[in-house]
Amino acid sequence: MFKHVTVLLKETVDGLNIKPDGTYVDCTLGGGGHSSYLLSQLTEGGKLIAFDQDEIAIQNAKEKFSSYGEQFITVKSNFRYLAEKLQEIGITEVDGILFDLGVSSPQLDTPERGFSYHHDAPLDMRMDQDAPLTAYDVVNSWSYEQLVRIFFQYGEEKFSKQIARKIEAYRENKAIETTGELVELIKEGIPAPARRTGGHPAKRVFQAIRIAVNDELKVFEEALESAIEMVKPGGRVSVITFHSLEDRICKTTFKRNSTTPQLPPGLPIIPDEFKPKLKLITRKPILPSDIELEENNRARSAKLRIAEKR
């Protein structure tokens, strides 16, 4: 069963300021938590299109929401293709779009997917099981320099060089095939005092490899710009991020699209192309409540930002 505890459920959906007869997009269907709450607020004229790369998530949602008929449409695709996939089904603008980034609990909890450092499993980490690049390819084929770069940039790992050296030396004799092998190499690359602080020692490197395998940051940046274009005036975009890299992209994109650039003084009117596209609904991110954190430990790093199309 595809179960998943949804983070910031009410805040994210209510933040879209739902119109009962509106058209909405859930870019990250997952276990269907946000979709379920959103669908419950729509009348017969309303519609929800949900994206996911995971076939299991799609099939589960089709069963779960079958009573909604044509009001609920699933799209098995990476949300980087948001605009073109919506256009394929005749939709050119929508009333709201939400993103819940990060790995859903079922993916983390399914050992053979290779996302978790708590289970020994083949090195995979693909959100889309049909995609060609796997974590095995990254760990065994990418150069020392490439590994250092992704561990540092995507994982913000202080010991990137030491860990990459351990990987490089190990794979000269044998391929690194499982998450368990990789965890041990990461531990060897981190000094003992540092291993005892800041959560699981493999957390940052696993995050970095997952981001690289799925090209997550570039995909999100492109999709967020696309979402801003597709939302109608008065429509909103809600984004939940789970680490500083995603949050920085969201914050920067929202800020750039909600500020007027420096223009020559004395202009009688601001030309349309320089008018801000967005109004910020959240100046600072919304964080999970203490009650939510008690119930769902995975919510601890979540941040929600919301913007409205002008």
From Swiss-Prot:
Residues that, per the record, bind S-adenosyl-L-methionine: G32, G33, H34, D52, F79, D100, Q107
Biological process annotations from GO: rRNA base methylation
Known catalytic reactions: cytidine(1402) in 16S rRNA + S-adenosyl-L-methionine = N(4)-methylcytidine(1402) in 16S rRNA + S-adenosyl-L-homocysteine + H(+)
Primary enzyme class: transferase
Keywords: Cytoplasm, Methyltransferase, rRNA processing, S-adenosyl-L-methionine, Transferase
Pfam families: Methyltransf_5
Keyword hit for Transferase: yes
One GO term describing the cellular component: cytoplasm
Subcellular location, record wording: Cytoplasm
InterPro entries given in the database record: RsmH, SAM-dep_MeTrfase_MraW_recog, SAM-dependent_MTases_sf
Record-level Gene Ontology MF annotations: rRNA (cytosine-N4-)-methyltransferase activity
Signal peptide: none
Entry keyword annotation includes Iron: no
EC number: 2.1.1.199
NCBIfam families, A to Z: 16S rRNA (cytosine(1402)-N(4))-methyltransferase RsmH (TIGR00006)
Function statement: Specifically methylates the N4 position of cytidine in position 1402 (C1402) of 16S rRNA.
Family: Belongs to the methyltransferase superfamily. RsmH family.
Name the record gives this protein: Ribosomal RNA small subunit methyltransferase H
Organism: Bacillus cereus (strain B4264)
